[in-house]
Amino acid sequence: MSNSYEKPLNDDEFVELGELLVAMPEPFEPMEPDYMDGFLTALLCLPDEPSPGDWMPYIFDSQARQDAALADPDEQDRLEELIYRRYRSIDTTLARCRPIDPIIYEIEDNRGRPVRGADSVAAVIPFALGFSEVINRWEGLKDSTDDRINGALLGILRHLPDDVAGDLAEIKADLDLESPIENLDQALEDIAESVAEIAAVTRGFEKKEEPPKKKPAPKGPRRPQGGRRH
């Protein structure tokens, strides 16, 4: 695999990715980047990852029609490169046990200002929808009997809209009542922890506890320390 695929996307390339996706001609229905990020993240949480040839057509078109492509072959190649680099970047993040940093578009008020508080949490809905598509399309997560996986899935799927939550609607309501998410930052942190928990089970990406460093023994009597306490 070329090292170029290991290079994370920069800010301009994230914009380019969105522009190429929206340029997909009709009648095809491509994913939007924030939805796609949930989709890719879920793929990388599966115990058995499908090949790119199996999942990439769904990014270009909701029905995975095989002729879904940009009119310019060079632009199509570029789009596929950006998608795969994003996929590899998420994989590297998970493998290094670092929190994911998903593509999110903040919710804005009628003056174009980002909303705050509980209303801002709606920005993670596309991520949850993309994640949900994968677990409904491929085996390994939704059908899991592992308590850690099932509990962590709720941390993501609780953000599904009420009209698609299905059997989770009652559990979702209980979570919103007992453990409400107060803002977007908290939602992103909760999702990152949930994804890490799933990847720890399905792919063995457990963060290793580092042994405490031994402090050197004092060489002589220590003088009392004055000053403020921190």
Each language-model region and where it sits:
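Domain-length accessory/inserted modules outside core catalytic folds
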Residues: M1-A128, S132-H230
